[in-house]
């Protein structure tokens, strides 16, 4: 049990499928593979499932067609047509657990970095959700479980043509004021260090180089000579 998510002790997702298969074998469940379902027809208290290989009759039906995620495996969206024909209302089909493509030319320079942080998602200026964990930075934007957790809110907002902004905080365990005090004390103890040297050990070097560049503070300037505003600029870049 990790943060409310259940995993096999082996950390192998295939173990879940294997367990299901073994239980199906124990119960003598009949499995039809490579069989396309064309229609589900309710008849009295039963269902007739029309397939490309003939009809199957059942007392109960669970429709788990996999949306449009993997057409090569059969998840091509045809399940929606089947459900609609049975009278179900179909809501807009949107991505639910995906990475986020972001604007910005700097992502190339930090691609491949994995870093602990918090992602907050804003829709039309209001924070609608946030999640914390390992964030993966890619050539196109951001990924990782925290990003997946907020992505459905982004997909819905973008579908509704709303403005979406993802804010990353790479020191979520401290408030802005606490982090400013922490860096000020660190600068007092290491006054001759440059920003890149000063932040070494706290963050990935690719991230440090990006923050220093964005701060427009000379990368050769000793942190002991930083003004309060320059220090706060670094804090805001790291936390916002």
Per-segment meaning from a language model:
Residues 89-92, 98-222:
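An anion/pyrophosphate-binding glycine-rich loop and adjacent beta-alpha core
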Residues 1-60:
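Feature captures the FAD/FMN-dependent oxidoreductase FAD-binding
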Residues 10, 14, 18, 55, ...:
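Electropositive phosphate-/nucleotide-binding environments in soluble metabolic enzymes
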Residues 37-38, 55-74, 83-84, 135-138:
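Short hydrophobic core segments
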